[in-house]
């Protein structure tokens, strides 16, 4: 067994480390002195109302006030606020928000403050956020350096998402040999990681290598976990379906689709991937048919994939899961179907309890409705919605009892 293989296996066994083990700072990909400076924050920065720090930070992030969220979050690692279930959640929330806003230097600066300077123990998500930040900026080697540090340190184990982020970055950089070594180093085979390799090889026209990987994984000695075997093969087949469409061989592509079992296609992961391919290649009839079958199990990704078609047909909203309302409202407004969005928007308010202020429409939904009303000339409704948004935000700030 190779050294790398042993390291990966051992890193997943236990997170415990000897007390005497010296702390090794997490690599940041840059000189810490070059990062944005963080002003000192003390406990006196916040008022004495009995509101949890976690709630305060979430409220600021929801209102897109990331600088205030950053200041508040830095209290999470102080002795007066350390809470096992909240501390790392708060850290990850603000780092993730900074990454979503593409404020990568701020995200890395916060990571350094929380997990190097304050020596709070991160979790896998904490590291994944920074690994992805490096990859998004094209700094793949910096991402790999942090990954290797995690393996050697042993207190945090890389997860499937870690390997997916790195595999995609390596494939995008045409570093296929390294991507293959990375995939083989996983202690537990993930079909999502191998699918990234298959799609990468197909994208550069290496059908033979993609097929070789597929055959190895569906053979009798497949490394795939038994419970994922059929779903994995369906995902791989969809990647080949996309390849044949790109080659202009629709008949071969549709034959793959016809051979997929209903139980496989109606799995959200597989179904979304099929929808993505159908929409990408203009197969509207087939996409709508599948969406109709999936609507009761669809998620926000399904809605996102189908969004460009919503202006063409009526969506059966009564069968839509409420977890999809957010994406659906934004999508409908963008495509001028404000009346349909309005119905879902009103329904979100019916579920809001007087004291449950983080339920119901968030800032993104309010903005979508306001822009939607303006785009169709309903200025009065836009103003009413703006006032509702202000009241909602004020209630978040004025609450007197922690959730």
From Swiss-Prot:
PPR repeats lie at residues 87-121, 123-157, 159-189, 190-224, 233-263, 267-297, 321-351, 362-396. It is found in: Mitochondrion. The keyword Transcription regulation does not apply. Residues 1-18 form a transit peptide. Its main location: mitochondrion. One of its GO terms (cellular component) is mitochondrion. The keyword Zinc does not apply. Keywords: Mitochondrion, Repeat, Transit peptide. InterPro entries: Pentatricopeptide_rpt, PPR_domain-containing, TPR-like_helical_dom_sf. PANTHER family: PENTACOTRIPEPTIDE-REPEAT REGION OF PRORP DOMAIN-CONTAINING PROTEIN, PLASTID TRANSCRIPTIONALLY ACTIVE CHROMOSOME 2-LIKE PROTEIN. Belongs to the PPR family. P subfamily. NCBIfam families: PPR. This is Pentatricopeptide repeat-containing protein At3g60960, mitochondrial. The lineage of its organism: Eukaryota, Viridiplantae, Streptophyta, Embryophyta, Tracheophyta.
């Amino acid at each position: 067994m190779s050294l790398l293989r042993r390291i990966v296996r051992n890193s997943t066994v236990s997170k415990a480390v000897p007390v005497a083990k010296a702390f090794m700072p997490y690599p940041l990909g840059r000189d810490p002195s070059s990062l944005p400076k963080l002003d000192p924050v003390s406990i006196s920065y916040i008022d004495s109302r009995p509101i949890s720090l976690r709630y305060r930070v979430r409220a600021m992030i929801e209102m897109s006030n990331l600088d205030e969220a950053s200041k508040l979050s830095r209290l999470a690692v102080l002795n007066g606020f350390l809470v096992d279930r909240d501390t790392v959640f708060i850290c990850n929330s603000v780092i993730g928000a900074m990454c979503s806003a593409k404020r990568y230097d701020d995200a890395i600066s916060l990571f350094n403050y929380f997990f190097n300077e304050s020596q709070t123990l991160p979790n896998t998500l904490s590291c994944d956020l920074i690994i992805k930040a490096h990859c998004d900026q094209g700094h793949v080697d910096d991402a790999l350096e942090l990954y290797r540090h995690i393996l050697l340190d042993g207190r945090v184990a890389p997860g499937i998402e870690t390997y997916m982020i790195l595999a995609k970055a390596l494939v995008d950089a045409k570093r296929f040999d390294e991507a293959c070594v990375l995939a083989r180093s996983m202690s537990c085979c993930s079909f999502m990681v191998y699918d990234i390799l298959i799609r990468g090889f197909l994208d550069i026209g290496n059908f033979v290598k993609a097929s070789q990987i597929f055959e190895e994984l569906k053979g009798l000695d497949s490394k795939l976990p038994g419970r994922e075997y059929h779903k994995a093969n369906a995902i791989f087949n969809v990647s080949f379906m996309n390849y044949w469409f790109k080659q202009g061989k629709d008949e071969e592509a549709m034959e793959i689709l016809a051979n997929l079992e209903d139980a496989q296609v109606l799995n959200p992961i597989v179904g979304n991937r099929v929808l993505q391919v159908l929409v990408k290649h203009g197969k509207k009839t087939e996409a709508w048919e599948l969406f109709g079958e999936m609507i009761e199990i669809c998620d926000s990704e399904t809605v996102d994939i189908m969004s460009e078609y919503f202006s063409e047909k009526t969506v059966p909203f009564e069968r839509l899961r409420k977890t999809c309302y957010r994406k659906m409202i934004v999508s409908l407004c963008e495509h001028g179907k404000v009346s349909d969005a309005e119905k879902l928007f009103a329904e979100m308010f019916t579920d809001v309890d007087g004291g449950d202020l983080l339920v119901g429409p968030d800032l993104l939904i309010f903005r979508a409705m306001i822009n939607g009303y303006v785009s169709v000339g309903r200025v009065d409704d836009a103003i009413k919605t703006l006032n509702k948004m202000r009241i909602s935000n004020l209630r978040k700030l004025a609450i007197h009892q922690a959730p």
